[in-house]
């Protein structure tokens, strides 16, 4: 369901991780979801609802440009935006845990524009109920 959307899907142990790059999710310095990203989030919601016996962590990440405090707040607001939208698509709120990591969990170097782009992302982690 997510093929061709720009969302990278990875399985780590029992978890399924959906990595959504920031460039397709939000405008710079904004927590407003890009209109072009709603169809992708609709597909994400279908996947999340398909795996109904899971907890859903929605985690916002930023690059290191700007202050750590600002980036922390931005990452939380972005995760909250995605979480709110998933709730509007019938994902139950009690399944959702929303957090922001700011610039603290980079997946690439913040020394290059390409690396910073990779670090600006929202991850959704599906963890089975135990």
Residue ranges, per PLM feature:
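Periplasmic OmpA-like peptidoglycan-binding domain that tethers envelope proteins to the cell wall
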Residues: 31-35, 59-130
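Short, aliphatic-rich beta-strand segments
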Residues: 16-21
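Periplasmic peptidoglycan-binding/anchoring modules of Gram-negative envelope and division proteins
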Residues: 2-11, 25-59, 83-88, 124-130
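Short alpha-helical interface patches
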Residues: 13, 24-25, 113-116
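Conserved catalytic motifs of the protein kinase core domain
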Residues: 13-15, 121
């Amino acid at each position: 369901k997510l093929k061709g959307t720009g969302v990278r899907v990875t399985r780590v142990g029992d978890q399924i991780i959906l990595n959504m790059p920031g460039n397709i999710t939000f405008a710079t310095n904004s927590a407003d979801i890009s209109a072009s990203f709603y169809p992708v989030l609709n597909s994400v919601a279908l996947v999340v609802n398909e795996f109904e016996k899971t907890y859903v962590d929605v985690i916002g990440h930023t690059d290191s440009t700007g202050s750590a405090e600002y980036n922390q707040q931005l990452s939380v607001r972005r995760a909250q935006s995605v979480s709110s939208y998933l709730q509007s698509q019938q994902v139950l709120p009690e399944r959702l845990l929303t957090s922001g990591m700011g610039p603290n969990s980079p997946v690439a170097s913040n020394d290059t524009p390409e690396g910073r782009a990779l670090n600006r992302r929202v991850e959704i982690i599906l963890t089975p109920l135990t």
